[in-house]
């Protein structure tokens, strides 16, 4: 699902709210979440999951074209951990 599809779906489910308001709301939610991660804050949405930053150590990588070794700097990357309810919903029963 893309951001546009989410906005369209929410607008259809809530016909009393204009599509523009839904679009602005979704954009603001994502902006606030991005800002929180930028400030190294953890985001927890009960029943859905949590977002946090994971630190990646500096390491030696390899250029796939040339095979040459390349030094990669340390960095923080966003990480999502699914919550219990989300895991249960997507787990298909065999």
UniProtKB/Swiss-Prot annotation:
GO cellular component: chromosome; cytosol
Pfam families in the record: Bac_DNA_binding
Gene Ontology molecular function terms on file: DNA binding; structural constituent of chromatin
Alphabetical UniProt keywords: DNA recombination, DNA-binding, Transcription, Transcription regulation, Translation regulation
SMART domains according to UniProt: BHL
InterPro entries with a match to the protein in the record: Hist_DNA-bd, Histone-like_DNA-bd_CS, IHF-like_DNA-bd_dom_sf, IHF_beta
Transcription regulation keyword on record: yes
SUPFAM superfamilies to which the protein is assigned, alphabetical: IHF-like DNA-binding proteins (SSF47729)
GO terms classed as biological process: DNA recombination; regulation of DNA-templated transcription; regulation of translation
Coiled coil stretches, renumbered: none
Family assignment from sequence similarity: Belongs to the bacterial histone-like protein family.
Assembly description: Heterodimer of an alpha and a beta chain.
Stated role: This protein is one of the two subunits of integration host factor, a specific DNA-binding protein that functions in genetic recombination as well as in transcriptional and translational control.
Name of the featured protein: Integration host factor subunit beta
């Amino acid at each position: 699902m893309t951001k546009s599809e989410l906005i369209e779906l929410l607008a259809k489910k809530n016909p009393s709210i204009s599509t523009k308001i839904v679009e602005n709301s979704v954009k603001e939610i994502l902006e606030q979440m991005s800002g929180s991660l930028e400030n190294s804050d953890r985001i927890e949405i009960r029943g859905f999951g949590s977002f946090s930053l994971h630190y990646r150590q500096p390491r030696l990588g390899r250029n796939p074209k040339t095979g040459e070794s390349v030094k990669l700097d340390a960095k923080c990357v966003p990480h999502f951990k699914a919550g219990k309810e989300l895991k249960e919903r997507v787990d298909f029963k065999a």
